[in-house]
Amino acid sequence: NPEHQRYVELFI
């Protein structure tokens, strides 16, 4: 889901 993707981008 897009919401999870946002957290992935913040993690990297």
UniProtKB/Swiss-Prot annotation:
GO cellular component, as recorded: extracellular region
Enzyme class, spelled out: hydrolase
Activation and inhibition: Inhibited by carbon monoxide (CO). This inhibition is explained by the presence of heme attached to the enzyme and modulated by CO. The state change of heme induced by CO (carboxyheme or metheme) may inhibit the enzyme.
PTM section of the record: Contains 3 disulfide bonds.
Annotated EC: 3.4.24.-
Tissue: Expressed by the venom gland.
GO biological process terms held by the UniProt record: proteolysis
MF annotations from Gene Ontology: metal ion binding; metallopeptidase activity; toxin activity
Superkingdom of this protein's organism: Eukaryota
CC cofactor: Zn(2+)
Main subcellular localisation: secreted
Entry keyword Protease: yes
Keyword list, A-Z: Disulfide bond, Fibrinogenolytic toxin, Hemostasis impairing toxin, Hydrolase, Metal-binding, Metalloprotease, Protease, Secreted, Toxin, Zinc
Function: Snake venom zinc metalloproteinase that cleaves both alpha- and beta-chains of fibrinogen, but not the gamma-chain.
Any further remark recorded for this protein: This is the first SVMP that is heme-bound and carbon monoxide-inhibited. The heme-binding may serve to regulate SVMP activity during envenomation, with both protective and aggressive purposes. First, if the venom gland is elaborating CO via the enzymatic action of heme oxygenase, then inhibition of SVMP by CO is likely important in preventing this enzyme from disrupting the epithelial barrier of the gland and injuring the snake.
Designated name of the protein: Snake venom metalloproteinase CatroxMP-II
The species this protein was found in: Crotalus atrox
Lineage of origin: Eukaryota, Metazoa, Chordata, Craniata, Vertebrata
